[in-house]
């Protein structure tokens, strides 16, 4: 029986016992209980906080329907939603007005062309890697692909909606999401990944291998985080780590903007930690960076319990991951006390933590394969191409890529 069902059964039983008028055969609180174990469990199953979290998990599971492992169907609704503002078609004027918001690409006669000046060459290269296999099957089209961290087209602007592709956004933006270049190359560059985090296909293998060597029973029952101080949203966890190092190991690393210990909350910068080495911990925290976190998808591969802070920033695959089903949601601005309560709840309910961790791993392993990323790119390009309502003429200021 799943751990959640056991917990719920005990909660119901305790309620029934506490409200029974028939005390025959029962050990009452004021009587000696020779046959009843003094401590049936290490956990107080009747705390209000326990009831709160169990109820949230129960509610999430009751409404959850697993998606099918075919044709990147888990993410189909995201593409439909993103393209809906352009159901009337994409005009040449719309693309021209959008040009300043990203890098211009053309597909003409199954060849790919790009404007000469790419702000982030590795990012453009990552994008082009996913476009290339689709060229033989695509109609002529023009695309404005934003390779910056930040989305571009605010939905509250009164101007015409413009078709700009971005890897990440919030609900305030109308950008069309595409799977980030970082699935192949051009992700965040740190000392451990000097050319930038990429090759999702390879990391899937290496991190899973590390996870296999750190079975749940062997993992350290600690919350873990390593990253730079891109925002103060991360401060409470780092401060909790300093106050309760037996519960949390969260430290700031140095980034390019680091000037003094103030930039790491008055502490010496910690060393960066390989993604594979995260797997030795049971609880892994994810925070947004400038936009959505490149770390997020990798954490699930450790088969550890992922605590995801904030729900504002999205990538194309985020909506398929459900809070309390695949990960533990944490509100932005959670205090040290709130974080401590949440971590301790799962430390006391180890089987429940493991069930969520397993579901998170299985979902990412089955529905965020490289073939799913390629599938999403294919569907995006084909459906976008059908919306283009003008004859695309070769722009000779662009350079041929493929």
From Swiss-Prot:
N-terminal signal peptide? 1-20
Binding annotation for UDP-alpha-D-glucose: 226-230, 234, 273-275, 291-295
Q: What is this protein called?
A: O-glucosyltransferase rumi homolog
PANTHER family xref list: KDEL LYS-ASP-GLU-LEU CONTAINING - RELATED (PTHR12203), PROTEIN O-GLUCOSYLTRANSFERASE 1 (PTHR12203:SF35)
**Using the chain's own numbering, where are the disulfide bonds?**
67-74, 72-375, 118-124, 279-302
**InterPro entries registered for this protein in UniProt:** CAP10 (IPR006598), O-Glucosyltr/Glycosyltrsf_90 (IPR051091)
Under which pathway is this protein filed?
Protein modification; protein glycosylation
Question: Taxonomically, which superkingdom?
Answer: Eukaryota
GO molecular-function term, one example from the UniProt record: UDP-xylosyltransferase activity
Glycosylation is annotated at 71
Q: What are the catalytic residues?
A: 149
Q: What is its EC number?
A: 2.4.1.-
Give me the ranges of the annotated region Interaction with the consensus sequence C-X-S-X-[PA]-C in peptide substrates.
189-194
- Pfam families for the chain: Glyco_transf_90
The family annotation for this protein states: Belongs to the glycosyltransferase 90 family.
List the residue(s) that the UniProt entry marks as the site Interaction with the consensus sequence C-X-S-X-[PA]-C in peptide substrates.
120, 229, 256
Provide this UniProt record's keywords sorted from A to Z: Disulfide bond, Endoplasmic reticulum, Glycoprotein, Glycosyltransferase, Secreted, Signal, Transferase
- Could you give one GO CC term from the UniProt record? extracellular region
Q: What does the UniProt record say this protein does?
A: Protein O-glucosyltransferase. Catalyzes the reaction that attaches glucose through an O-glycosidic linkage to a conserved serine residue found in the consensus sequence C-X-S-X-[PA]-C in epidermal growth factor-like repeats. Regulates Notch signaling by glucosylating Notch in the ER, glucosylation is required for the correct folding and cleavage of Notch.
Q: Which GO terms describe its biological process?
A: positive regulation of Notch signaling pathway; protein O-linked glycosylation via serine
Location within or outside the cell: Endoplasmic reticulum lumen; Secreted
């Amino acid at each position: 029986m799943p751990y959640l069902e056991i917990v719920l059964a005990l909660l119901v039983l305790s309620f029934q016992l506490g409200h029974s008028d028939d005390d025959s055969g029962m050990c009452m609180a004021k009587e000696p209980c020779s046959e009843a174990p003094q401590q049936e469990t290490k956990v107080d199953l009747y705390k209000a906080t326990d009831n709160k979290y169990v109820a949230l998990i129960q509610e999430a599971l009751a409404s959850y329907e697993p998606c099918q492992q075919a044709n990147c169907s888990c993410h189909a609704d995201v593409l439909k939603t993103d393209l809906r503002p352009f159901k009337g078609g994409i005009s040449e004027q719309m693309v021209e007005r959008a040009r300043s918001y990203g890098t211009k690409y053309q597909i003409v006669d199954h060849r790919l062309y790009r404007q000469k000046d790419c702000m982030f060459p590795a990012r453009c290269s990552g994008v082009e890697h996913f476009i290339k296999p689709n060229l033989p099957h695509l109609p002529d089209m023009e695309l404005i692909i934003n390779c910056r961290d930040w989305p571009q087209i605010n939905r509250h602007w009164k101007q015409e909606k413009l078709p700009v592709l971005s890897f990440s956004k919030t609900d305030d933006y109308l950008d069309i999401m595409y799977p980030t270049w970082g699935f192949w190359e051009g992700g965040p560059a740190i000392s451990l990944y000097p050319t930038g985090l990429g090759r999702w296909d390879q990391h899937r293998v290496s991190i899973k291998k590390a996870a296999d060597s750190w079975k749940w029973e062997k993992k350290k029952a600690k919350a873990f985080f390593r990253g730079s101080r891109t925002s103060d949203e991360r401060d409470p966890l780092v401060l909790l780590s300093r106050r309760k190092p037996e519960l949390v190991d969260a430290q700031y690393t140095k980034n390019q903007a680091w000037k003094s210990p103030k930039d790491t909350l008055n502490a010496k910068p910690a060393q960066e930690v390989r993604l594979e080495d995260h797997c030795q911990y049971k609880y892994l925290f994810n925070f947004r960076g400038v936009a959505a976190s490149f770390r997020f998808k990798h954490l699930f591969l450790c088969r550890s319990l992922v605590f995801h802070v904030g729900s504002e920033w999205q990538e194309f695959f985020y909506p398929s991951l459900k809070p309390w089903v695949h990960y533990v949601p944490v509100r932005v601005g959670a205090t040290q006390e709130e974080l401590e309560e949440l971590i301790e709840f799962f430390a006391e309910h180890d089987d429940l933590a493991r069930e969520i961790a397993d579901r998170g791993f299985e979902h990412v392993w089955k529905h965020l394969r490289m073939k799913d990323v390629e599938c999403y790119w294919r569907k995006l390009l084909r459906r976008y191409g059908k919306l283009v309502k003008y004859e695309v003429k070769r722009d000779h200021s662009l350079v041929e890529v493929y």
